[in-house]
A protein has these predicted regions:
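Sec-dependent bacterial lipoprotein signal peptides
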Residues: 1-22
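Membrane-proximal, proline-rich intrinsically disordered regions
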Residues: 22-68, 307, 312-313, 319
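Conserved, well-structured interaction surfaces
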Residues: 81-153, 184, 201-204, 363-370, ...
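Inward-facing hydrophobic residues that define packing positions of alpha-helical scaffold repeats
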Residues: 108-111, 190, 197, 242, ...
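Short coil/linker segments at helix-helix boundaries
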Residues: 152-192, 240
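Hydrophobic-face positions in mid-chain alpha helices that act as interaction patches
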Residues: 237-376, 408-415
Length: 415
């Protein structure tokens, strides 16, 4: 009987020891990378504060840059039909509105987590790296909300934006299941974007990355500010930040169209030309995004979406081959023209990159790289701001600088 009692005591002791060991095991984070407790982890986390699902394909199909060239071109799908017709999307893919919404809010969540983590590490005063990381986080949060409010709401205007429905502005990491958020209004969203933008501008730097153009840096922040304030109808601010971005010699900052003019534009050579266009060493590229995207295929020498295209009619009557205020001179970077199995007039801009998930089976995802912010856009934003302010001479100076950089014309525009 005594032996049996000792056996029970020993069994209970071992069981309690096991439970204690189990508790210790469960109290330990299985992957310490999940705890953002160092500068390096904060900086790594900010890599996910940029959306990997682009809005540019839908935006291009929604625009006047794409036309319906008829059923003789069979390259289409329900997705392309829907976005061209501005119809309700009934399916989801990497560039659907559902993915855009989710991906940009996911990027915002990462930015918010980085902001919380930096505060837990002592704040931006702790080190230059954390200070610049905080600036990047604020800018990422501002940029993602800016894209969302312009994709899903009416454009800002002083007359109606205080009553136009906005989007939820997320400033903290999510901590509850299925919470309810208020959309607010567009004016409120813009005010919050400006608040984050100003904070980010004061802190952002260029020192945390070996290739800073895949992250917000000083020049990219200035270019974003110029774009934002153009939409916000604060035109003096556009000029202020465009000046900071472009410097005293804007011509040295613009895209190298003389170099692009020497590169081949036929379909076999599409890839090197597009890769040069998004090269981080090019001065014009201020912020580069990578994305799961068919842009390089839908706007390339492929039959994808061939029913809807930028073709000969648009080129000759509306844009790159039509008469312009400076005449009908040619662009230095001549477009590729296809008029057989598809009707396309294309400038090589987005590379077609295939990411294999199974090289043996030959399956994976199409991806691309694109300039989210560039000096050429910044210059045109400044020109538009000058127009709004009635300074037509300065506007023409900027427009002439842009035209002579990309076009062979000798003519100047005057007020």
């Amino acid at each position: 009987m005594k032996t049996l009692k000792i056996t029970y005591i020993l069994a209970a002791t071992f069981a309690l020891a096991g439970l204690s060991a189990c508790n210790k095991f469960l109290d330990t984070t299985p992957d310490n990378r999940a705890t953002v407790d160092s500068e390096e982890k904060v900086i790594s986390l900010l890599g996910s504060a940029y959306s990997e699902n682009d809005h540019i394909l839908i935006a291009e199909f929604y625009s006047d840059n794409v036309d319906n060239y008829g059923i003789q071109y069979t390259g289409t799908s329900r997705f392309f039909d829907s976005i061209y017709e501005w119809s309700e999307l009934e399916e989801s893919n990497n560039e659907s509105t559902e993915r855009i919404w989710g991906s940009y809010y996911s990027a915002i969540a990462s930015a918010n987590q980085a902001i919380i983590a930096i505060d837990g590490l002592g704040g931006p005063e702790t080190s230059t790296a954390l200070s610049q990381a905080l600036g990047e986080a604020y800018l990422c949060r501002a940029y993602s909300h800016f894209i969302l409010v312009n994709m899903f709401c009416l454009q800002y205007n002083k007359q109606t934006s205080s009553t136009d429905l906005g989007i939820p502005y997320m400033t903290k990491p999510e901590t509850t299941l299925a919470p309810h958020y208020e959309r607010g209004n567009v004016a409120d969203v813009y005010a919050q974007i400006e608040e984050d933008l100003v904070k980010g501008l004061a802190l952002v730097g260029d020192d945390n990355y070996t290739v800073p153009k895949y992250h917000f840096n000083k020049l990219a922040a200035y270019a974003f500010a110029a774009r934002f304030y153009l939409f916000y109808e604060k035109y003096d601010e556009v000029i202020k930040y465009a000046d900071l971005c472009l410097g005293s010699s804007p011509s040295t900052m613009l895209r190298d169209y003389d170099v692009l003019a020497t590169m081949p534009n036929g379909s076999p050579q599409q890839q090197p030309t597009t890769l040069h266009y998004v090269d981080p060493s090019v001065n014009a590229n201020l912020l580069l995004f990578t994305a799961f995207s068919v842009m390089g295929q839908a706007f390339g020498a492929y039959s994808t979406a061939s029913m809807y295209s930028h073709g000969a009619y648009l080129a000759k009557n509306e844009d790159c081959q039509a008469n312009q205020p400076w005449g009908n001179s040619a662009y230095k970077d001549a477009p590729a023209v296809y008029n057989g199995s598809m009707d396309r007039v294309i400038f090589w801009r987005c590379p077609r990159i295939f990411q294999y998930t199974d090289p043996v089976a030959g399956i994976g995802f199409l991806r691309t790289v694109y300039p989210a912010l560039s000096t050429d856009e910044c210059l045109l934003n400044r020109a538009e701001a000058y127009v709004h302010l009635g300074d037509y001479n300065k506007a023409c100076e900027d427009l002439n600088l842009w035209v002579h950089n990309c076009n062979t014309t000798k003519a100047d525009m005057t007020p």
